[in-house]
From Swiss-Prot:
Entry binding sites for S-adenosyl-L-methionine: 137, 139-140, 145, 163, 193
Lineage: Eukaryota, Metazoa, Chordata, Craniata, Vertebrata
GO MF, one annotated term: catechol O-methyltransferase activity
Pfam families: Methyltransf_3
Protein name: Transmembrane O-methyltransferase
Organism: Pan troglodytes
Keyword Isomerase: no
Length: 291
């Protein structure tokens, strides 16, 4: 006859030792008690990161989370809300007062991600020093830096500004005209910089840009600089200014400018508007010529 089966409380079988339910469930109970301990072990690291990068977290909240929420609730973009504020608080025909109003709105209401007063002073000083006959701005955004350049242009100076987004360009156009600058002095072109640069000479009668401001997407800076070179739009001695070269950063652009041998480079260190602890800067390049 075969080996008899023995039935016991738990797990039983032929020749198997008795295993109680408590013993079987014991590892599951141990795993459950270890999770809080692991979480507590990571708590100091999380706190350290939050403290160290608190400025970046605040920036993320203001530029992404709160902005997206207000976009959904209002049905308007941040540039459109900013322009509505300017209409009710700024003096028409006074570009300085309009700029101050935008700064106040960005600091006290919604963060605008604009150039801000510190970088703005650097930009205006350089435009006044260089006295360019023609300026090309790539990245109009809300028109803040456009007003800065237009204020500092010499008599008879001309500014062409390029914005790829039609809705943003419409806001910038209204702001520029509200400040008192007409189309002969400030011309806004709607289109991507990649498409507009090859057409500047033929369609917009721009044979040379004495000063260029790159203020759109940092990852496009190198491409657009090389396009300007390829179409011979930079005369010897031309100044190229590039915003946001440290944050979010344009490393390939800076590496090219420093290594190609055609530019003298200088970096103006600043912080972000309302976030001075987040380091940024404006690159100033002086073009020596193609040779």
């Amino acid at each position: 006859m075969g080996t008899p089966w023995r039935k016991r409380k738990g797990i039983a079988g032929p020749g198997l030792p008795h295993l109680s339910c408590a013993l079987v469930l014991q590892p599951r109970a141990q795993v459950g008690t270890m999770s809080p301990a692991i979480a507590l072990a990571f708590l100091p690291l999380v706190v350290t990161l939050l403290v160290r990068y608190r400025h970046y977290f605040r920036l993320l909240v203001r530029t992404v989370l709160l902005r997206s929420l207000r976009d959904c609730l209002s049905g308007l973009r941040i540039e459109e809300r900013a322009f509505s504020y300017v209409l009710t608080h700024a003096l028409p025909g006074d570009p300085g007062h309009i700029l101050t109003t935008l700064d106040h709105w960005s600091s006290c209401c919604e963060y605008l991600s604009h150039m801000g007063p510190v970088k703005g002073q650097i930009l205006m000083r350089l435009v006044e020093e260089k006295a360019p006959a023609c300026v090309l701005e790539l990245g109009t955004y809300c028109g803040y830096s456009t007003l800065l350049i237009a204020r500092a242009l010499p008599p008879g100076g001309r500014l062409l500004t390029v914005e790829r987004d039609p809705r943003t360009a419409a806001v910038a156009e209204k702001l520029i005209r509200l400040a008192g600058f007409d189309e002969h002095m400030v011309e806004l072109i709607v289109g991507s910089s990649e498409d507009v640069i090859p057409c500047l000479r033929t369609q917009y009668q721009l044979s040379r840009a004495d000063l260029v401001l790159l203020a759109h997407r940092p990852r496009c800076y190198l491409r657009d600089l090389q396009l300007l070179e390829a179409h011979a739009l930079l005369p010897a001695g031309a100044t190229v200014l590039a915003d946001h070269v440290l944050f979010p950063g344009a490393p390939r652009f800076l590496q090219y400018a420093k290594s190609c041998g055609r530019y003298r480079c200088r970096l103006h260190h600043t912080g972000l508007p309302d976030f001075p602890a987040i380091k940024d800067g404006i690159a100033q390049l002086t073009y020596a010529g193609p040779g």
